[in-house]
Amino acid sequence: LYDMADGHLILKAMVNDGLAPDDTASYLTGGIYTKDRFNIGYGKVEVRAKLPSARSVWPAIWMMPQKGPWPDAGEIDIMEHLNHDRFVYQTIHSRYATTLKQKDPASYVTVQVSPEKYNIYGVEILPDSLVFRVNGWKTMVYPRLEEGMYAGKTQYPFGEPYYLLIDMQIGGNWVGPASGEDLPAEMKVDWVKVYELKDALED
């Protein structure tokens, strides 16, 4: 479910009270993704968005690989927000961090925000690190390990073609059971900017 108003993309989370009679789901959510349409390798992604505060609602801005299994091929969570939290999560997933549960370097950070205001969530995908930002402020650097038994794709699978997802979800083990208590809810996206890393293109 989505709408456009005043140049903003609006992604919705709603109770399915007859809006989609042929859909048996109790709730309906909106989302967009660039899979098989647009790839991002080394570069920078920024999204200016305003988030809902609603029970069991889970808006996210994230990236997944075009090819490869999860979590070995990686996942980059530029922003995830849960319920009525006044902070967001920025997280990476890989075989090293998720399957092997290695905690050095740290794979996530929480960042205080005012979700009801527009904030800019971003990540720089570089050959040697991921750099996360909120409103231009550096929040976490996830470096590529150059030595050790897990150095390489196991720890740092990033830089391969990834696609971007911006979506709303309702319910789950992390955010809690689905609830229509605070619905409908909306995530508003002002703009999305993607930059390619010039040096990587020239290699």
Over which residues does each language-model region extend?
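GH16 jelly-roll
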Residues: L1-D203
